[in-house]
């Protein structure tokens, strides 16, 4: 049976991850730790013998720079890369820029968990005159007005991620190309939910650690056979737990 592999990687720690702030579509750089995490991810992929044919990422530099660091480690800087806003992090609306722990202290841990992890629950909207509204950003100049979010849930994130997977990425994987996707916690949760046919309740508890390669193996019909992280299991579990705890009051 022919097996095709796909690698998913959440970006390394960003400056706002480090500061425990809601980020969303805000274009925040990797922290020094995040760059090191991305390089380590590249080393793991190199040690496992991964060689890629194509890469996808978002239009946000924390994901782009994670991909750059990975490709540097596997010596494939020349690899063709397609960037799409459809792989962006979920838009966190008016929460973008706020401290997660302070927000939890104000509204309660349960409310913040619902905003962060609830399937169809959206954070408070931005207004379109807010400087954080993506309509003011030139990288989104070609988007239709209805494509510019003022907030998003995981459900609405799925509505942009899955068509992009089905129409753009999946055909490459299906023809045997080795693809890597460097994206974000929620755009990857959207894809994982779809690939694994996860329930809304199960996805609520799924936390994707920063910069740990997640490998999916597919059969000839593009059905997932199995998936697994590369790296030390205890370290990966600790990273996932840290992600889960970000939205709690101190």
Swiss-Prot record:
Concerning Pfam families, the annotation shows:
His_Phos_1 (PF00300)
Q: Which SUPFAM superfamilies match?
A: Phosphoglycerate mutase-like (SSF53254)
What keywords is this UniProt entry annotated with?
Answer: Gluconeogenesis, Glycolysis, Isomerase
Q: Which residues bind substrate?
A: 10-17, 23-24, 62, 89-92, 100, 116-117, 185-186
Which reaction is catalysed here? (2R)-2-phosphoglycerate = (2R)-3-phosphoglycerate
Q: Which residues form a coiled coil?
A: none
Q: Which GO terms describe its molecular function?
A: phosphoglycerate mutase activity
Keyword hit for Isomerase? yes
> Where does the entry annotate site (Transition state stabilizer)?
184
Instruction: From the UniProt record, give the pathway where this protein acts.
Output: Carbohydrate degradation; glycolysis; pyruvate from D-glyceraldehyde 3-phosphate: step 3/5
Question: What is a biological process (GO) this protein takes part in?
Answer: glycolytic process
Q: What family name appears in the similarity comment?
A: Belongs to the phosphoglycerate mutase family. BPG-dependent PGAM subfamily.
Oligomeric form and interacting partners = Homodimer.
Q: What is the documented function of this protein? A: Catalyzes the interconversion of 2-phosphoglycerate and 3-phosphoglycerate.
Protein name (record): 2,3-bisphosphoglycerate-dependent phosphoglycerate mutase
